[in-house]
Design a protein with these regions (language model features):
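Anion-binding alpha/beta catalytic cores of soluble intermediary-metabolism enzymes, centered on
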Residues: 1-283
Length: 283
């Protein structure tokens, strides 16, 4: 069993939906038995959540006593209300889980939702879990990528964000040719795990991808050049020209239902909501 895959799951903020999601998800019969699952959190609090859900008549949940739990007895006065306590605990759960995964070959990490505001009010100044992961693993070149397999066709849908948890007004200043090239490298490498010579699309930043500088100049100033430079470095890769963001995900939406045979294998979104809105609607 030691060499079997290990999945480490954090409970996230205990006043949020994380514990409930875990108890429901791990009741599924579809999870392979050969996978070792370890929950990082507070066992007493997880049992309390289980009993509360059962009192509501919810039956399709797993008893925490049947789970392997890394029991961190971090003081949280009230797990029913979001507070600095729940924010601090969720941060420490993730820190501990990261160390477990770093020391465990053939392992993966699943994070439950946290409250970014409560992290900061508890003294942990990170804009999200991604940023803590990047720092903890000494990996500055990371990406937030969303992948899902269509239940209708088996086709895999991939979207990577060039920028993540920053105000939208800062996006044009955060983007540059080097950032776009590094994110294209990550996206292509990931998509290539599932398909040889994957097709990659890049969404424009401005409406209609700037309309040649009329609706914004970032595309003309550096985004088009970044795509051109990446193509030169990767001549065999299938990277499209810049696509208007309002139509960039249309073929993906059709492919999810099996109505399109030639969707992109990966899409690079230039900011958080540009990518997350279509991803959540489609999947």
């Amino acid at each position: 069993m030691k060499n079997n895959p290990k999945i480490v799951i954090t409970v996230g903020d205990e006043a949020g939906v994380g514990p409930e999601i875990i108890l429901k998800a791990l009741a599924s019969r579809e999870i392979p038995k050969k996978i070792n699952i370890l929950i990082v959190g507070n066992k007493k609090n997880l049992i309390s959540k289980y009993l509360f859900l059962r009192s509501l008549g919810i039956e399709n949940i797993v008893d925490p006593n049947q789970l392997a739990i890394e029991d961190l007895k971090i003081t949280v006065k009230n797990v029913k209300e979001p507070s600095n306590d729940t924010g601090n605990a969720s941060f420490l759960y993730l820190k501990h889980a990261i160390e477990i995964v770093k020391k465990s070959p053939n392992s993966a990490l699943v994070t439950s939702p946290i409250c970014k505001k409560l992290w900061n009010s508890a003294g942990h100044n990170y804009s999200g879990q991604t940023e803590l992961l990047s720092e903890s693993c000494d990996s500055p070149n990371v990406g937030m990528l969303f992948t899902a397999k269509s239940p209708f066709t088996g086709w895999r849908f991939n979207t990577l964000l060039a920028t993540t948890h920053i105000p939208i007004r800062e996006v044009p200043y955060k983007l540059d040719k080097n950032l776009i090239n590094s994110k294209l490298d990550l996206l292509y490498k990931f998509c290539n795990k599932f398909k040889d010579k994957p097709t990659i699309h890049v969404a424009g930043l401005n409406p209609h991808a700037g309309e040649e500088g009329i609706l914004g100049t970032e595309e003309v100033d550096f985004i088009n050049q970044a795509i051109h430079d990446w193509k030169i470095k990767n001549p065999l890769a299938n990277l499209s020209e810049l696509i208007s963001p309002d139509s960039c995900w249309i073929s993906s939406a059709k492919a999810w239902r099996g109505n399109n045979t030639n969707p992109p294998d990966g899409i690079l979104a230039l900011y958080h909501d540009q990518g997350l809105i279509p991803v959540k609607i489609i999947t």
